[in-house]
Amino acid sequence: MPRTHAIEDYRNFGIMAHIDAGKTTTTERILYYTGKSHKIGEVHEGAATMDWMEQEQERGITITSAATTCFWRDKRLNIIDTPGHVDFTIEVERSLRVLDGAVCVLDGNQGVEPQTETVWRQADKYDVPRVVFVNKMDKIGADFFKCVADIIGRVAGKPVCLQLPIGAESSFKGVIDLIKMKAIVWSGEALGANFAEEEIPAELKDQAVEYRTKLVEACVELDDDAMTAYLDGVEPDEDGLRRLVRRAVQLRAFHPVLCGSAFKNKGVQPLLDAVVDYLPSPVDRGAVDGLDFKTEEPVKREPTDEDPFSMLAFKIMDDPHVGTITFCRVYSGKVESGTSVLNSSRDKKERVGRMLLMHANNREDIKEAYAGDIVALAGLKDTRTGDTLCDANKAVILEKMEFPEPVIEIAVEPKSKADQEKLGIALSKLAAEDPSFRVSTDQESGQTILKGMGELHLDIKVDILRRTYKVDANIGQPQVAYREKLTRRQEIDYTHKKQTGGTGQFARVKFVVEPNEPGAGFSFESKIVGGAVPKEYIPGVEKGLNSVLGAGVLAGFPVVDVKVELVDGAYHDVDSSALAFEIASRAAFREALQKGGSVLLEPVMKVEVVSPEEYTGSVIGDLNSRRGQIQGQDMRGNANVINAMVPLANMFGYVNQLRSFSQGRANFTMQFDHYEEVPRGEADKVIAKYA
């Protein structure tokens, strides 16, 4: 099937928001209006619309199905879902990695909230152009201009209004379009389908002129010709203004702000127009960077069907009907179902079996996908989130996604043999779906250990195990994922010698072991010259070192950020072997860690507490008692916002404590920030507990 829409007519965008800002309702209304204007698949207009407006559960699943395709003004919109909760930052990261643009939804009453700040920062990191939709303008306390001020004050954004609200709270009835200089007023209860353009109400005329001038001035600054004309008294016409706003969005020069009430069906069609008019197509975003699979030289892949095929897997889901589904974004070239492609991240061949396009309310089997498409592939065997799939003859590895290390863990013990089998299958599926969720086995106790980004993250995984996979298990208390680190450079010369009649064992290694940069991990280099340790024994050396990394000398926690150089050694023609060098390396490395002043590291969390002012003293006192360091505080509306860095070990059960002394009126968010050395007294307690 040939391409139905030119790549210039694609908009791959996400809707990002704090958890209750109305993201789902906005997405839902977008699907409703786009579904009405285009029959999707074979479903009758009325049936499709009603089906998926009513079946909340189905729709919930569809929207989280990571990508939904719909159409507006003959443009093809691929909406990529981004969750709003801090424990799932990884989900947001991987969505933003494949987006070309975003709509940031704000709650008109709350303005910029903690998760809004987090997703905004991540969008900045990936340079994602965005427009802002101030939602819930019908809500008591809604304040459009406070939201605009928040964008400047809290996320250092550059808001420029394209619309102003007409009325607020229960009297909100429409918006002023500052480009057309018309009022758009919705009427009746026809699910927002009926609206009319009218003259701007007299009492709002001056305000509209003021904000229109701000818009025009922000636009003409980007174009010398437009600026010259403006200084001569000639304003850009409607099309010219739209062109300049589009350019501003692409350059991230400013963020257009619109408003409405998705729940009351007001303002959604103009928002769709803004997506089409201002957010970039894949062509606007340009070529994607990668590395040549063979030479590792930097290469680019252009967003055209003619370039060699490349795509990135950004989400994996388990579907009850189809099995494992891998969501991918095609960056260049085209791919047909039934063909064989290379997973260049793992150097494995994959066969593209079923290829699906996820619509708002159904799945469509497709035979081929082109640059710019977002598709779901069924039945891939070895592909994980962040992997590149490409043409084997022109192989490329696209820029990898970075996944944070887990900071919290719990032990899980199945109650019966049948549960043990179900647990194994379920955990391998969950780990494939979520790269920030890890599973390991404790070597000594044999327990299964689940690791994640926070208490909520692991609670949800346990809930899925019980409800979806019907696994009955005992769950241990959450534990902190401590780390160990060397602090002083060591030179260790170690000889392993064993003679027991017959062939003996002999290996000598000399290491220089020193601390690595924070976050640099483990590195090993052999500096052997002249064959003091033959090449065939080097893998044995590495194996010995790696066996110590998993369990350090203080309390058996993983060792991080250490650099090892093999500088000398000796071998015996008969008695040396890879095993002998493995044993020698293990013993030498442990000795270096013991003598090199190893210390314990703990995860430190960035905590934000939003509390009524009268509880501020209690909140700060409590955080101090948890070894917290207060970073600052400011006012948000009539609430006080306290920012602190607190060790994760002291944050378990915090939610209940905070609720009890604030009578449920304060709330908090936290996310991992960095690892830090544990104070001596605390470290001794931890070592005594685990060693």
Swiss-Prot record:
Q: Which InterPro entries does the entry link to?
A: EF-G-like_DII, EFG_II, EFG_III, EFG_III/V, EFG_IV, EFG_V, EFG_V-like, G_TR_CS
Intrachain disulfide bonds: none
List the keywords (alphabetical): Cytoplasm, Elongation factor, GTP-binding, Nucleotide-binding, Protein biosynthesis
Species of origin reads Methylorubrum populi (strain ATCC BAA-705 / NCIMB 13946 / BJ001)
Single GO term (MF):
GTP binding
Cellular location of this protein?
Cytoplasm
Q: Give the chief site where it resides.
A: cytoplasm
Gene Ontology CC entries for this record: cytoplasm
Question: Which amino acid positions bind GTP, per UniProt?
Answer: 17-24, 81-85, 135-138
State any GO BP term from the record.
Answer: ribosome disassembly
Which Pfam families does the protein's record reference? EF-G_D2, EFG_C, EFG_III, EFG_IV, GTP_EFTU
Residues in tr-type G domain copies: 8-283
Q: Which family would the database say this protein is a member of?
A: Belongs to the TRAFAC class translation factor GTPase superfamily. Classic translation factor GTPase family. EF-G/EF-2 subfamily.
Q: Cite the SMART domains for this sequence.
A: EFG_C, EFG_IV
Its biological purpose: Catalyzes the GTP-dependent ribosomal translocation step during translation elongation. During this step, the ribosome changes from the pre-translocational (PRE) to the post-translocational (POST) state as the newly formed A-site-bound peptidyl-tRNA and P-site-bound deacylated tRNA move to the P and E sites, respectively. Catalyzes the coordinated movement of the two tRNA molecules, the mRNA and conformational changes in the ribosome.
Q: What is this protein called?
A: Elongation factor G
- Entry keyword annotation includes Nucleotidyltransferase: no
